[in-house]
From Swiss-Prot:
One of its GO terms (molecular function) is ATP binding. It is found in: Plastid, Chloroplast; Mitochondrion. This is Probable phosphoribosylformylglycinamidine synthase, chloroplastic/mitochondrial. Essential to the male gametophyte development. Phosphoribosylformylglycinamidine synthase involved in the purines biosynthetic pathway. Catalyzes the ATP-dependent conversion of formylglycinamide ribonucleotide (FGAR) and glutamine to yield formylglycinamidine ribonucleotide (FGAM) and glutamate. In the N-terminal section; belongs to the FGAMS family. It comes from Arabidopsis thaliana. It catalyses: N(2)-formyl-N(1)-(5-phospho-beta-D-ribosyl)glycinamide + L-glutamine + ATP + H2O = 2-formamido-N(1)-(5-O-phospho-beta-D-ribosyl)acetamidine + L-glutamate + ADP + phosphate + H(+). SMART domains: GATase_5 (SM01211). Pathway: Purine metabolism; IMP biosynthesis via de novo pathway; 5-amino-1-(5-phospho-D-ribosyl)imidazole from N(2)-formyl-N(1)-(5-phospho-D-ribosyl)glycinamide: step 1/2. Mg(2+) binds at D787, E826, N830, D989. HAMAP family: PurL_1 (MF_00419).
Amino acid sequence: MNTSQATRAALFLNGSNRQAMLLQRSSMSQLWGSVRMRTSRLSLNRTKAVSLRCSAQPNKPKAAVSTGSFVTADELPSLVEKPAAEVIHFYRVPLIQESANAELLKAVQTKISNQIVSLTTEQSFNIGLESKLKDEKLSVLKWILQETYEPENLGTDSFLERKKQEGLHAVIVEVGPRLSFTTAWSTNAVSICRACGLDEVTRLERSRRYLLFSKEPLLENQIKEFAAMVHDRMTECVYTQKLVSFETNVVPEEVKYVPVMEKGRKALEEINQEMGLAFDEQDLQYYTRLFREDIKRDPTNVELFDIAQSNSEHSRHWFFAGNMVIDGKPMDKSLMQIVKSTWEANRNNSVIGFKDNSSAIRGFLVNQLRPLLPGSVCLLDVSARDLDILFTAETHNFPCAVAPYPGAETGAGGRIRDTHATGRGSFVVASTSGYCVGNLNMEGSYAPWEDSSFQYPSNLASPLQILIDASNGASDYGNKFGEPMIQGYTRTFGMRLPSGDRREWLKPIMFSAGIGQIDHTHITKGEPEVGMLVVKIGGPAYRIGMGGGAASSMVSGQNDAELDFNAVQRGDAEMSQKLYRVVRACIEMGEKNPIISIHDQGAGGNCNVVKEIIYPQGAEIDIRAVVVGDHTMSVLEIWGAEYQEQDAILVKAESREILQSICKRERLSMAVIGTINGGGRCTLIDSTAAAKCSKEGLPPPPPAVDLELEKVLGDMPKKTFKFNRIAYAREPLDIAPGITLMDALKRVLRLPSVSSKRFLTTKVDRCVTGLVAQQQTVGPLQITLADVAVIAQTFTDLTGGACAIGEQPIKGLLDPKAMARLAVGEALTNLVWAKVTALSDVKASGNWMYAAKLEGEGSAMYDAAIALSEAMIELGIAIDGGKDSLSMAAHADGEVVKAPGNLVISAYVTCPDITKTVTPDLKLGGDDGILLHVDLAKGKRRLGGSALAQVFGQIGNDCPDLDDVPYLKNVFDGVQALIAENLVSAGHDISDGGLVVTALEMAFAGNKGINLDLASNGISLFETLFSEELGLVLEISKTNLDAVMEKLRAFDVTAEIIGNVTDSPLIEVKVDGITHLSEKTSFLRDMWEDTSFQLEKLQRLASCVEMEKEGLKFRHEPNWKLSFIPSSTNNNYMSQDVKPKVAVIREEGSNGDREMSAAFYAAGFEPWDVTVSDLLAGDITLDQFRGIVFVGGFSYADVLDSAKGWAASIRFNEPVLSQFQEFYKRPDTFSLGICNGCQLMALLGWVPGPQVGGSLDTSQPRFVHNESGRFECRFTSVTIKDSPSIMLKGMEGSTLGVWAAHGEGRAYFPDEGVLDHMLHSDLAPLRYCDDDGNVTEAYPFNLNGSPLGIAAICSPDGRHLAMMPHPERCFLMWQFPWYPTSWDVEKAGPSPWLKMFQNARDWLESC
């Protein structure tokens, strides 16, 4: 599956044209541009690069390159970049698909010049070599770099420079990554090379080259504009010439002393400005006094940087814990005390609260599938474990404003590490996300409420770019890591208020939360003891993310733009996953877990995480023990940079060997950087400098850091913040006479906070892990609408956890207190649709995003906290954690633009039965469905802060509120009682857009019609329909009406019948008997989907978007049918002492192994966890297995094409290759490849197999980029055809849904003869089909564009099957997001896909 190389034109339009670039044009009209470096322009070595005069050969290279040797974990050369002796180049065409190329050309002609008549692309691989490659190894490198069926499209000379067109002017533009840091792409590419024995490769970066032909010579500014269009200025640059060196000529800066003893505070003020330390008045006073009067010496620049990061607002939350003075009156409680008061009043089931990296509540005793010998090759079996439910939430706002894609990547990655670094380590399960940005100003969109006069800051990305790139970054990171994203929210806002203030999210919100699990025995971190080892595990150090903690604590625009860039981190999801696998192996050891304590590296880098892990005992740390990927880094940079994918852990000395063994298996670096010494200090030494001094007969240099922990990390003096409340001017909502309901809906349904979120959900994996019981999409058409997200704890139990989000920031512009209460109310009215253990078990994360230190905002935040506390205590629920981001403002057009203050409530709770979840899609027809309205506002209909007000350029003056808190409690308990007895068929909360939007959305999702008949009770039409007062709409059966009403009355809850459901797809809205709307469901749904589809066109192929948009008008419930009845595996199989062994094989970046193991386990197999590392090391051989499975995921992060690196690691390691060849030939074995494994089997030639003529690379079928050019995740329909496949026996003739999630799933047949032979032999057993069950190539039914709907290929003997969809993620019915009510199945039971795995078991029995 590939997302990083999803070759959509829009992905090359994410640069910025707001900043002029210094570009140089040579006399030959080739534009390479300037390589901008961290400090000064890079001086490139201009010696001529070595030319390799070789051409791509169609023959396969020989396999005998690597003999399977393996290095130790502490060496891991792929992680440590060595200087390259030379840089060689290979070029490959094309860079992007033909359709994407045409789209890019069209955009260029529109934005740059219509004189441009053609555009051609290629990619350049810039390869750093430690020494020359021999011919045999060179052929291997070429195989890795080339497309297997197009070897002629790879060469050592540029293809673009050969092209000429008579009478046209040509210019070449090349863009690529900045050289100041190694990209994650290069890290994975080098890792692939190492796995194939190409140890000479030290770095491999990819650049993109564009050839423009124009009728007239392009002007300099036009070339600059094009360059800006096709690269990200924050992470990339334009190359002025062919790279001949990766050296940056950066000289590491020596440790400096800051003359505080001589110059006092002035010295700190100067370094504060120079380094962007974000010291405020109180900081400057405290640290001047600390060093002059207490420590009595000059601090080093490393110490000051250290203090700035670990004691920044971002890290220490001074504001939340500080003293507040409002309107001249000291407040008796801090914000932290106010929020914690809810937890102190209602702890109940809390096991971790207001400490650690996450919070947790008491879970259940469950049977978890886990390895018997974690950290080594072994079988998996179920064991009873006491698992608690865990939750964490945080934001990554500042980085996303500066560089949205990497900022969001690392936001997601940092939160993932917060999850797994809780207690002594914990399990990552699923994520939620949220985005708040300014006005999109999307070209061609209908958004008359957006103010076209607003100016946007040049140092920040535009709101539109942030929404697209940040969501791409977070999605791609989660997809590669293997964490499903199952819930979220989106909001845009930009308006000048009646007070004259402009409020807008120029500094955006990128919200990321995670729900996971933790073994109850691991909830408490161990305390450091003398002799314990301080260990860092994860990726190497790079010069990135310098000062992120301090920079994120400032209003955007206060800091230097280059410092802002330096503060943005870079993510490597594949490295993050390897890190998590090491942590998971440790925690699955149970009571033998070697991890005593764990903290993830985030804001402040080592500055923060190391001091956290050694506090209060202290340790001496050797900076040179840290694994670095850039040897030019200074002590300051190694200590302070926020390079990601790192944890600090404490282990006992005797655990060192087992930890090294686990790290070696997962190919992760491990470094012991110090030992707990009990001195209470953090002392940072430089052993290299000390050795040099010793050699020269000099005393060792003083430590770069030597600080008493208590004085910089312990109880430091509180800060005091003073505010006055501000009464902002308000104006009543004024809707012009003559505005109709349809006029209003045309606007409201297009507002991003209301409209479809399809553009966010189809690009993110929502099924990986197999533990997702409820994600965003619902109903027969899989519309993005779910209110609550639900996870399962295991594959064998029905217990789980649910989470839901509430946030109402626009209401806060009118009344911060009401906003807080509404956020709580929305979270609960979303959460209520999952059956939970009890309302009193609900806990929540509270995330505060305010410009808190600006006038009026601190007091508003304080008032909101008081209201939040009071409401939660009355409800019996509590906040148990959260984060704050308190510099939510940016400079623009001469003013400070504050973001609307936002409080995001993420409620989470335990579920006794995950199958009892109600979705919003209407299900009842034939006059049986009745709609009930449960009104929490008891008749009030206030429009202030509503979507209606926003789309008419106003906010109004009368704010909705939760006036009766106890009534919300009654409603929650009452609806829970209805769900327990299966009396509710559909339900949805009332939120953005009001009652009418809630009802419409339910109809959209169910593909039904509705008749709404409402009474105005003396208020206006718009108040009746669009007020966003809290409430619920329930669909119930007419036969259950009396029972429902009676049960609600038992909870003192009243409900009103407001309409009925119809099978006819027509929506009719009456108020006081007058019809105000009568329109087709599809027509209104098209309005609701319009904004999402426009955003989709900026992310995937426009023709695919149009096809889906038009097709949606005619969609109907899929016509699925089964040719068999699913059943659980026979107990005789499950109880056998000896079961057939199946090797579940994974490579670096694979992420589908556990759900695959669970599926085979459920079919009576003994699944084994086997890595390629195990096979290379000889720890296991394949001769003991009857089945092998190649799992899904992103092996090597899909670098160099999907599964290419995995295939290379097998093909070019002789001992491993021979094992696979022998296994393939054995007549009593079978193999299965899913997704990435499917792509691998094609590359290995296992399907359709040599007998069909597909063994040569040039004719072997491959799975290539989806036609849409993007990763796609959908629950799609497939039909099962007759075939020899042993795993699909007895399933022929069935049509059903299955999860599919990939970026490269389009079957491609270079040789038509192979395709014909394959079809004639019935070797394409699985086909994508439409709603009628017909095989199709139409998008999105066929999500990748495979010819003839081909979704799977098998071998002629049926033993080997490769398929792109994921049956292992839906082998249980609760994993299905929807299925026909006509199916005779139990939601708690097996799904039809289990039969696939049972068939394999039956076949083995018959052999």
